[in-house]
Regions:
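Short, Lys/Arg-enriched N-terminal segment that forms or immediately precedes the first helix
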Residues: 2-17
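Short hydrophobic/aromatic patches at helix-to-coil boundaries
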Residues: 3, 73-76
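Amphipathic, hydrophobic secondary-structure cores in small proteins
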Residues: 24-54
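C-terminal structural segments of small proteins and small subunits
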Residues: 50-74
Length: 76
């Protein structure tokens, strides 16, 4: 299902990562959360491809579909 995402307990403490790199899916998500654009991410990390970034986002979306979600309180 996910050709670009790999998992190995001996790499990055078992976090899912982009195959052929040592960049975790979590790290890629944090880049976007901090405001980076896709073009900025691809320019800064040339080992990533458009396909690998898209797959990381899809992997994350699939992961939270089946996860327990925590309550988030919003301050007004």
């Amino acid at each position: 299902m996910f050709q670009q995402i790999a998992y190995n307990p001996k790499i990055l403490s078992g976090k899912p990562y982009i195959r052929g790199t040592r960049l975790s899916v979590e790290f890629v998500l944090e880049l976007f959360a901090s405001g980076a654009t896709r073009d900025e991410v691809l320019k800064t990390y040339p080992q990533l491809t458009t396909e690998s970034v898209e797959e990381a986002l899809k992997y994350a979306a699939q992961s939270v579909k089946n996860d327990v979600l925590l309550d988030v309180k919003v301050k007004s």
